[in-house]
Every structure is written in C-alpha cells, then in structure tokens.
Regions:
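N-terminal leader/linker segments that precede catalytic domains of diphosphate-processing enzymes
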Residues: 1-164
C-alpha cells in the first residue's frame, strides 16, 4: 500500500522524467545476506553515508558492475550473470568485509525499474547465508552502520519513515 511519501516521490520522478526523458541503465549487483537467529531469519542491511549516492538509505551490499568484473565468453559476448556474480562478491567484500564464495551465491532475480525512474539500475539480485565465523565489518566511510533486520521489521520501519 502506498503512503503519502511514496506518492510525492512518484510525482517528483514523473516531473523529472518529463524534463529529462529516459535514463540509461547502469548494470549492478546486490546480495541479500541472511542468517538464522532465535527470532527467525534476519537480513543484513547497511546504512550509506549521507554524503554518497543513496545517502542515509539502508541497503543490501551491492553496487555498480565495474570493468574488472566483466566475464567474456569464447564468442566475445558478455556473460552477464557471471559478470554480476563477480560484482556481487566484490561489493560484499568491500562494503561488509564478508568474503562470499561464488558457489554459495544464488541468483534469484533481475530488476529493471521503469523508464520514469531518474537513475536506473539493471540489478541482479543474489542471496546467500552468512557462514559461521563470518563477521560484518564496515569502513565508516561509504557505509556508516549495519544491522540485522527481520524482513517484516525492515518493511514496517520503512513504512513508518524510521528507515529509508
């Protein structure tokens, strides 16, 4: 269910789109890291520094696909999923200091927002489970905070405007 904040954000996007037109897609990858807890499954979320893109928002580890992530097939074509997998493992290590084995990453979705969105990421979504002994470490630069949320808790906090 949409709330007033969502409606005003959509109106801004709509106005911006009319002025600017369709934006190019930016290839990206993100990882939903899960762990078991006494209260059930929890998801790792990271809070971005207010001075960087998506500042202040709570996000899953992830980001843009870099040139160094690219995997080229023998026929010269780009292997998009392998490339996204490389980016997912790199971003998780950079943002949360968690080394994720590619064998433990499970690709589950690919999202492309509508053309009206001002900044459009073509995002590959992966899931993995936190392994015993892995600990989250943030750099206090790009990422300033981390927390483990139950899925319904994160949605409720977002709907209440307590996290973005």
């Amino acid at each position: 269910m949409a709330n007033n904040r969502d409606e005003s954000r959509y109106k801004k996007w709509e106005t911006d789109h009319e002025k600017r037109g369709t934006s190019d897609l930016i290839p990206a990858a993100t990882v939903v890291i899960m762990r078991d807890s006494e209260s059930g499954i929890e998801l790792l979320m990271l809070r971005k520094n207010s001075k960087v893109a998506f500042g202040g928002m709570w996000v899953f580890p992830g980001g843009k696909i870099d040139e160094t992530d690219k995997v080229i097939n023998s026929d010269g074509s780009l292997d998009e999923l392998a490339t996204a997998t490389n980016a997912a493992t790199r971003e998780t290590l950079e943002e949360a200091a968690i080394s994720v084995s590619q064998e433990n990453l499970f690709w589950f979705s690919h999202w492309v927002p509508p053309a009206i969105t001002p900044k459009r990421f073509s995002t590959y979504f992966f899931a993995t489970k936190l392994l015993d002994g892995d600990e989250v470490t943030i750099d206090d630069s790009e990422i300033i905070e981390h927390n483990w949320f139950r899925p319904h808790e994160a949605i409720s906090l977002r709907d209440a405007g307590e996290i973005e």
